[in-house]
């Protein structure tokens, strides 16, 4: 168990069995949302009270161990290896998320876009546009955007370093005040005041222990391979957990991995903002952008960024994905091509859409409508009226959209 002697608090909160069980029921609902028809959820629900009570006792007794994960390959939007936790472990992940999400979020910069409520790709594109407008004096002055990418990010996260970063962050935040204006789930019987600290509403001894259990888990240990071995043909060895150094990699597919991807690179975000003093910067997972009027200044940051990532986090900057573009010619970021006063769907995103649309089964109207609706939703935030008409205004998809008049009225309107 991790030491927590430096948690300087006068009234630390201690998690009770009743509270943990209550929170596990809430975490179950989070994990099962939209999946109640899945066989593994139904099986767990058959003995829900018993299963959650057993899980509660394991967590309180510090005997909890994750079950082997399922490993398989997905091809969209690109080929990658996924490790999916068993359903009971996903409940634990959602419990951890409920306990720590708002704590970790307070440590992030405003321009971290992924896996944060109220942010995402659209928010990231809006912030990129905001930074460009500021740096270019509303598109009037010369300005450059430099995009950066990390090679095989999830496969090269050092779990020992991550554990150190996460635990130090939790310990530091335990002393911070929660804030009465924030909607924070509180334990039963706890009242929030202006002076309440996080350590008075969260059991940090429990959180530090659970952090270690989740971070240090080796996904390869006794994992269950799903699919044919040939599914792995053509997968870059740098993106396959069998070929990475022991102690590296987080399982793509787990909720906690999404949280930790931000926790790990928050160190880099702080370096860019505070040490490099880059005012105009944003990051979505491992894709980041730096904007500045001075092209030479941006180029001068590349070796500094490369050295910091390697020395502090053991990560390698993808040399082939460093791009500098004059912003008036357009900047591609998060599937969108941003130009002065307008945005377009990027060519790569459009190619993926067209490929997926070829696989849509038009005989299943409801499922097909969901697919079409998702793509139209993406396109609706860009200058794409003619593109939407060409893809969905005629032919088989037009007949499908005629089936839903509201969709036709909303998405095919100029």
Where are these regions (language model features)?
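Intrinsically disordered, low-complexity and often Lys/Arg-enriched segments
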Residues: 1-14, 180-197, 407-414
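Non-catalytic, polymerase-adjacent accessory regions of viral genome-replication enzymes
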Residues: 1-53, 413-414
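Active-site-proximal segment of RNA-dependent polymerases
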Residues: 10-11, 97-159
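Short, conserved non-catalytic motifs in the polymerase core
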Residues: 34-42, 67-93, 107-119, 218, ...
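Short Gly/Ser/Thr- and Asp/Glu-enriched loop/turn motifs at secondary-structure junctions
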Residues: 67-69, 282-286, 319-320
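Right-hand nucleic-acid polymerase module
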Residues: 85, 94, 231-247, 270, ...
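Conserved polymerase palm-domain catalytic core
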Residues: 131, 136-285, 289-304
